[in-house]
Amino acid sequence: MQGNVARQRAAVIEVRKQLASDIAAHAQSLGENPTAIPGLALYRLTTPTACLLTTYEPSVTVFAQGRKRINLGGIEYFCDGSSFLLSSIDVPVESQILEASEQVPLLSMFLRLDMPTVREVLSREDLPEPEISVQNRGVAVGETTVGLLGACARLIELLETPEDIPFLSHLIQREIVYRILRSPQGGRLRAIATAGNLSHRTARAIAWLRANYAKPLRMEELAAVARMGVSTLHHQFRGLTAMSPLQYQKQLRLQTAR
């Protein structure tokens, strides 16, 4: 038993090294490095940072090395080379790079999640139903596996053969979505993608509020977008974002002002 665990850990470390090498090869500039694959960006950072306000969109960020802190409504999440960050909704957060240097830069892969692709995977795969809870925040940190790391490495390696991107990139992205959905954090993503349930309807209200943050907030109007009562929406909204709709709007306005 212990031997199997040791072999699994060794395999994860080996694939993570390959992912770090792939990211480093294609992320030559500091900060964000857009790629020829739609929705895929690679990051290289060499210094710690102060807290920065930013808005996460539905996405998965896989870390190969370095360390980062995320603050969502007073709840802290820490990401390092053994983890991935899942954001299933549009949400304002504070982020801070904790560990990064010239010798060991923070290297990560950002992939925007395409909800039609998520629904496509859900319709074809026999995945277990998630336990829906208001404690299922829209942001979560999970542990990377050989399967997830390997799929991410293969997606980045497509950049070396651009002619393969149109055919293979979608297939590999479907695998990445599948790996996330099979993880303990997958229920969060499934709940958002599944039409009709409270999380999906709340996400619709969140998207509307982000698009209309400059307007005065009227809870009755927002509740109508979500097709639920005001008190239910308030409860669900706080469950996903760790803040009220008004606090969410203020965070968006603050970020825009900066």
Please identify what each model-predicted range represents.
Residues 35, 188-192, 218:
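Short, hydrophobic secondary-structure boundary micro-motifs
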Residues 2-18, 118-175, 179-180, 187, ...:
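Amphipathic alpha-helical segments enriched in hydrophobic/aromatic residues interleaved with Lys/Arg
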Residues 207-228, 238-258:
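Terminal helix-turn-helix DNA-binding modules in bacterial transcription factors
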Residues 32-129:
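N-terminal regulatory/effector-sensing and dimerization cores
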Residues 51, 135-143, 193, 221:
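A ubiquitous short alpha-helical element
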Residues 9-47:
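N-terminal, Lys/Arg-enriched amphipathic/low-complexity engagement segments
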